[in-house]
Amino acid sequence: MNANAQLSRRQFLSLAGGLATVCGLGLVGCGGSGASAATTAAASTDAATDDSANITQLTVGFDQAYPPYGFVGDDGQFTGFDLDLAAEVCSRNSWDIQLEPIDWDAKDTLLSSGAITCIWNGFTMEGREDDYTFSEPYMLNGQVVVVKKDSGIASLADLAGKAVITQTDSAALEVLQGDKADLAATFASLETIGDYNTAFMQLESGAVDAVACDLSISQYQLAAKPDAYTQLDEALSSEHYAVGFKKGSQQLADKVTETLKAMDADGFVKDLCDKYASYGISYDNWLLK
């Protein structure tokens, strides 16, 4: 794999530590003790009525074109690192599993309606904490930029005047519309598309100059075509993956976290990371140790 395909663990932890500090700062309300008591009472009521872990089936919503976390294998079956994790969690809790490929734009509607139980597919939690109940984060990730090796693009600054593409409603898009909006303003265009497989087809054809994507997606593509692509050394951001549930489903989120920790303790997770190592998955980035 090209050396540019990897960010150092130290760089990730440094970036992630900054994010954790920012995300850990809360806003102190100006209301009196009555408002505080009401909030506490409401939270207690929600906790008392939460029976989300009382399930017999976990319906996992995922993007089927998001390797290595969820994709269609050579045998035509759904596979991927996250789907294997989910299957093992279900097995250990005697739950049936239903894998439900979804339109990523429709994920919130499907979750709120109960059509899916969770979103488990390289799902970034930063910036979404108020919209979902999350498991504890289980994997460190980052947003990066991939270009063609012969493009002459060597830094983020070199993207000025270039056409950049990313997935609709993705973490990369959120970064480029938020913290990195000034950078995006220098692009000739910032395009969005439904899946990353098509984005990389456009990069290969020359229709766009760069793809902004998850580190894991980058590593997967570079492993598949090491002579075609390279990853810029500068990362757009660092982030964490977690399993997203409907708001209020804390018991279920906690149960999944508890099971993932047990899977790490008995070596299952390490073996699974090794299985997907050629796809860019590294046990070094696993967080629930």
Stretches with model-predicted labels:
Residues 1-11, 15-26, 30:
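N-terminal secretory signal peptides
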Residues 87, 96-158:
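Acidic, polar ligand-binding/catalytic clefts
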Residues 106-109, 122-131, 175-178, 204-237:
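A ligand-binding cleft/hinge motif common to bilobed small-molecule-binding domains
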